[in-house]
Each structure stands twice: as C-alpha cells, then as structure tokens.
Amino acid sequence: MNTTTSAAGRSLKVLVAEDNIINQRLVISMLTTLGHTGVVVGDGEKALKCLAKLKFDAVLMDVMMPTLDGLGALSAIRAQEQTTGAHLPVIMATAHGEPGDAAKYKRAGADGYVAKPIEIDQLNAELKRVLGIK
C-alpha cells in the first residue's frame, strides 16, 4: 500500500457526503493520510448546501443517504453546472456494489466509482483518475 503519495502532489479539498459515522471517520483518515482535507456532511441536501458555500476539488458521494440520496444530489450538482459552466468531479460510493455499477453511475453523471469498504489505494487511484493526475 502506497499511502505516502497524494493523488495530486498537492493537498486536495474533498467533500465527503456519507451518513455512516464509521465510514465518515475512515474516509477522513484516508484523506488525511494522503495529505488531503475532507469536509463531512451526512446527506445529499447538506452536500448541496455545503457546495453552495465552499469550493472543493472533488466530491465522494455515498449512494444511499437520508433526506436526499447520492444520485439525487449528483443530479442537482450536474444541473447547477449547466448554469455555472464549472465541472466538479464526483465519485460515487456504495456498499451494495453490483456488476455494472460503475457504468450505471457514469451514465447518471458521476466521474468515478468506488465500492465499500473503500481501500486507501483505491481512493487515491480514483481521485487521480477523475482529476486527470498522473
């Protein structure tokens, strides 16, 4: 496991939309280990409010959350981008992974996908890929 090399060679700011506190802590720990900063919200509605106030390099979005699920939040993010013209990379995450999920979420507008439990190398690789970092 290569946990000392960050995805960008610089610190990223990642919005983590995840309702499970254990998963929140694990992802924040991984991001910190990679040299990044994470901001946690517990549902899609809070994610949209946070995105309206703060700038992020990427979003890690749980699929199944209360209030507004990850796909609903993703749809709202992509609709907002039509107005702003700015693209925000979104990586979807789910514990109920099935074959074809990555393609399904890509069709819904996601840039990337990780299956839970998330591994640090998997997260790092997907951040690099969606941000176009070699």
Where is each model-derived feature located?
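Active-site beta3 strand of CheY-like receiver
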Residues: 55-60
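Receiver (REC) domain active-site loop signature in two-component systems and cognate sites
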Residues: 65, 97
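Helix N-cap/capping motif at the beta->alpha junctions
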Residues: 40-49, 70-72
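C-terminal output helix
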Residues: 28, 118-127
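Charged docking surfaces used in two-component/phosphorelay signaling
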Residues: 25-33
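Conserved acidic carboxylate
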Residues: 18
